[in-house]
Amino acid sequence: MSDSMDYASSGVDIDLEGAAVASLIGSLQRSTRKPGTPGAPVDLPGGFGGLIEFGSHLLAMATDGVGSKLQIATAVKQWGSVGIDCMAMNVNDLLCVGAEPIAFVDYIAVPKPDPEVHAAVGASLAKACELANVTLAGGETASLPGIVTELDLSGTAL
């Protein structure tokens, strides 16, 4: 067994991911608003946050999830940091484009609701909002038996 700690050794094909994202973006470009109109994208190289025109200002948004770290949280049954991690990934993406995060929405998908787990994730998200000085403006909780096998958490920051 290899001691390598990279995407390929974990089963992730970065080249295939890149091709899939390029295909997705290529399909979406036809629906993009035109420059000079509210909501039109602003191209800023190197950023993970999306920028759009918003009158005389720019609005920045970022979406990210906790990813494979949720497998660790599930294995050790510790949820106290997953909301903070989710917020941090999103806030960091906005800071990278020079934006100040002001609001956040979350998306939690589970195979079956668990009030104790939901309370712990909620407490973690509340702490994350406090740390980032961001308002939790809403979110979605989806019970998806047969579609997801363990909790998934993602969010969008504005």
Regions found by a protein language model. Give the residues of each.
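Glycine-rich phosphate/pyrophosphate-binding loop regions near the starts of catalytic domains
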Residues: 23-158
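N-terminal amphipathic/basic leader segments beginning at the initiator methionine
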Residues: 2-35
